[in-house]
Design a protein with these regions (language model features):
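Pre-Walker A (Motif I) flank of P-loop NTPase domains
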Residues: 10-14
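Hydrophobic anchor at the beta1->P-loop junction of P-loop NTPases
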Residues: 17
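Walker A (P-loop) phosphate-binding loop of P-loop NTPases
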Residues: 22
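ATP-dependent small-molecule kinase phosphotransfer cores
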Residues: 37-134, 210
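A glycine- and Lys/Arg-enriched "phosphate-lid" helix/loop adjacent to the NTP-binding pocket
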Residues: 111-182
Length: 220
């Protein structure tokens, strides 16, 4: 991992965080951002869907339109891909090309897990769609913070923050979230070098330590 002074001529490192709802991604992203900042490592934090003006507008449509205005599954996967394409070309690739590290809250693995395994859409189609939307730009390392669907549901119920808008994906049935979790586990099984499973039931400091250990072992 290179400092700000060293990174001007080097490609940045791309790190993504994945996992079910309320797995602690936001906390771990913040801790990793602080870790990099303390070492003068230039880093940008972003999210999907979102990360750009257009991406944030698509996020509102895909996550918070409920009832009769909710998007159908086929439209949902295409909207996620549209947000990602804009994100990749306008933010992620330019940052990495400038030697800036990118930490992304969700990326293409979420589309495979949620829309592929969760919704039951064609996996090969999603793989092709992801490849097109990302322009082949994939994370150097992906951390999946793993929780059972039951643990995730309990955290959602007990969390302190209140959502101003209903999140229709978060509020989906337990059976859906069980399929999503299996999707993440299968992705990690197929790509063990890139995708690392970390138990999200551990203390946040322990999880952070494991993340740093994996970063230091994989990214030089």
């Amino acid at each position: 991992m290179k400092s700000k002074e060293q990174s001007s001529t080097a490609k940045g490192v791309f790190i993504s965080f994945e996992g079910p709802e309320c797995a602690g991604k936001t906390t771990q992203i913040r801790m990793l951002q602080e870790y990099f900042a303390q070492r003068n490592i230039n880093t940008v934090v972003t999210r999907e869907p979102g990360g750009t003006v257009i991406g944030e507008e698509l996020r509102m449509i895909v996550k918070h339109h409920v009832g009769e205005t909710a998007v159908v599954d086929e439209a949902e996967v295409l909207l996620f891909a549209a947000s990602r394409a804009q994100h990749v070309h306008k933010l992620i690739i330019p940052a990495l090309s400038s030697g800036i590290n990118v930490i992304c809250d969700r990326y293409s693995d979420s589309t495979m897990a949620y829309q592929g395994y969760g919704r039951g859409l064609d996996l090969s189609f999603i793989e092709t769609l992801n490849r097109f939307a990302t322009a082949g730009c994939m994370p150097d390392l992906t951390f999946v913070l793993d929780l059972t669907a039951e643990e995730s549901s309990e955290r959602i119920i007990n969390r302190e923050e209140t959502l101003f808008l209903e999140d229709r994906i978060e509020s989906a049935e337990l059976s859906f979230h069980k399929k999503v979790r299996q999707g993440f586990l299968e992705i990690a099984r197929c790509e063990p070098q890139r995708v690392k499973i970390i138990s999200a039931v551990q203390p946040k400091e322990v999880i952070h330590g494991q993340i740093i250990g994996l970063l230091e072992n994989v990214i030089k």
